[in-house]
């Protein structure tokens, strides 16, 4: 899954990445995703088929035997969702979330991050974004830096000896 998400991100193929997230992470149906992404249900089905083939290929390359039918059915869908949630292969990096909060992402990235946060509701990324947007208590940050510097003074003195 990480390899698939990385390949889609590298190619800036956000349409397919949104479909992958919607299907494998959020467990959305083809029809629902088609409506949200303003695509035909056939387009979503075709992309889903290609994504499943790529996932199967990646698993085979990793040395595991798998059949194309493993990704169908309720149990497998739950397994994919759990794995996607655990690995978070399509979550934007904190730097990307920071740029999103500042409004300086390229339009295609901004659209993807908005989809990931607002439509899929990724709680991990929402928490990261909230942390990035939280006001900084400068007095607390200064006290923390001072404690850090005080705790390392002896270490650096010994390192030079």
Regions found by a protein language model. Name each.
Residues 24-29, 105, 121-124:
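Short alpha-helix boundary/capping elements
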Residues 80-118:
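Short, amphipathic alpha-helical interaction patch
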């Amino acid at each position: 899954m990480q390899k698939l998400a990385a390949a889609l991100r590298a190619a800036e193929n956000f349409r397919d990445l949104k479909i992958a997230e919607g299907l494998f992470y959020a467990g959305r149906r083809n029809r629902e995703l088609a409506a949200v992404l303003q695509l035909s249900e056939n387009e979503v089905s075709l992309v889903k088929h290609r994504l499943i083939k790529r996932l199967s290929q990646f698993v085979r390359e990793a040395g595991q035997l798998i059949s194309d039918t493993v990704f169908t059915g309720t149990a497998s869908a739950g397994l994919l969702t759990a794995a996607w949630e655990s690995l978070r292969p399509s979550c934007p990096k904190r730097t990307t979330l920071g740029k999103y909060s500042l409004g300086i992402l390229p339009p295609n990235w901004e659209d993807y991050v908005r989809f990931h946060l607002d439509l899929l509701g990724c709680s991990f990324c929402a928490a990261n974004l909230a942390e990035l947007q939280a006001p900084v208590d400068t007095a607390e940050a200064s006290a923390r830096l001072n404690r850090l510097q005080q705790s390392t003074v002896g270490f650096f003195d010994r390192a030079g000896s």
